[in-house]
Amino acid sequence: LTDFRDASEEILPGDQVLLQRTRTGIEMLNRRYRPDGQDLFFLLHRPRRWNAGEGLWMGYERKRGKLTEFNALLRGGSRGCFSEIVGETAILPAIKYVITLDTDTQFPRDAARQLVGTMAHPLNRPQFDAQRGIVAEGYSILQPRVGVSLPSARRSWFVRLFAGDAGIEPYTREVSDVYQDEFHEGSFIGK
């Protein structure tokens, strides 16, 4: 899922070169790793749209917008919000779980298996209440605890002030989350 960076213009020099490079990379990965002829890698790119509040051309609602529009596509919605799609998308409606990674995400070995296993557990499976329009039981989003790595702990005054001590101290830093414990809900933390 990609957007171009925010800009004062809708189209910048170099946009198409970057998009073509990404397209070529995705196509190369699919040629190399395609089992049974099904694509494993996709590019879904959105164009910049004018945001009057920000006074910029940008991807609609940034990360939240990308995930919302991608989720709609997975559920059979329109492809119209994406200006460039690479990969055979027929498989997309069969996708059950989505794991989002950022450039600063640390994703240890077997973490995906553990996340999917947690979501697939019978007590965690979301039960949608169509009348109220909510997930009434279980969970539809799982977010591991957000932490600060040792290398980034001194990056800025903001990080030092709000992150506390960095590193691993499992016994002195273990805490519960009041919202999760009492209401079975959490505060989503994202970029």
Q: What do the PLM-derived regions correspond to, one by one?
A:
Residues 1-191:
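Internal catalytic domains of large membrane-associated glycosyltransferases
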